Amino acid sequence: MMTSLGNDVLRARLQSGAEVLAPGLDAAQIDRLMDFLALLQKWNRVYNLTALQDPQEMLTQHLLDSLAALAPLRRQLAHLAHLAHSTGLAGPGQGAGPRRLLDVGSGAGLPGVVFAICCPQLDVHCVDSVGKKAAFIGQVALQLRLRNLHGVHARVETLTTPFEIICCRAFAALPDFVRWTRSALRAPDGVWLALKGKHPGAEIAALPADVQVFHVERLTVPGLAAERCIVWLRPAALA
């Protein structure tokens, strides 16, 4: 059980990290991130959602690690909005409607829950083949009143509903990731976002010819010395 002082320390660390990684978050969003951390600790005792037990480690390695991807995600969303405006596209997720993001192998909801809290314009679906993990996402959406967050109990390769962005974190090698999710990627402007540790050169080399890596972006996570990066991919036909 976290003491009030312990929560104050965690909140201060979260606030400090958010100011660096995700400028512009308001107090309500910080509150929701803290509430998510509390739910993660509570449910983890029963459901074993993460190997981490210490809330300080959860904050750094889960919340801040996910927040590190927020600025790149926002840039991609801005690019999609510009593309839709310049081409006059008005398909699903275009125009005034929300963008659809699929978080694959979401587990404890990372980074999907963080994205849903910080990007209300996103409609986030967290898919996991383990029912209790999908149920946890549903509970988070209910308790935090996140109408843009959905837990999906399914195998990702069975999904065919289109998404503009498909992301993963510690899920699978890049060739498997794109192969299992290709049917759910929306044309013509859909992209994959893979959160990785070290630069995955061997995985990139093993990708099929019809998949293009268009950007590898290094990330810095406050309090974490380990290497982090984002690999952005798209079907090569979009190049």
Swiss-Prot record:
The Enzyme Commission number assigned here is 2.1.1.170
Where found? Cytoplasm
**Could you tell me what reaction this enzyme catalyses?**
guanosine(527) in 16S rRNA + S-adenosyl-L-methionine = N(7)-methylguanosine(527) in 16S rRNA + S-adenosyl-L-homocysteine
Report residues binding S-adenosyl-L-methionine.
G105, L110, V156, E157, R169
Q: What class of enzyme is it?
A: transferase
Domain of life, per UniProt, equals Bacteria
**Molecular function per GO:** rRNA (guanine-N7-)-methyltransferase activity
Q: Which UniProt keywords apply?
A: Cytoplasm, Methyltransferase, rRNA processing, S-adenosyl-L-methionine, Transferase
- Show which residues constitute the signal peptide: none
Keyword presence, Nuclease: no
Q: Which NCBIfam families match?
A: rsmG_gidB (TIGR00138)
Record-linked HAMAP family: 16SrRNA_methyltr_G
**Which family would the database say this protein is a member of?**
Belongs to the methyltransferase superfamily. RNA methyltransferase RsmG family.
Q: What is this protein called?
A: Ribosomal RNA small subunit methyltransferase G
Q: What is the lineage of its organism?
A: Bacteria, Pseudomonadati, Pseudomonadota, Betaproteobacteria, Burkholderiales
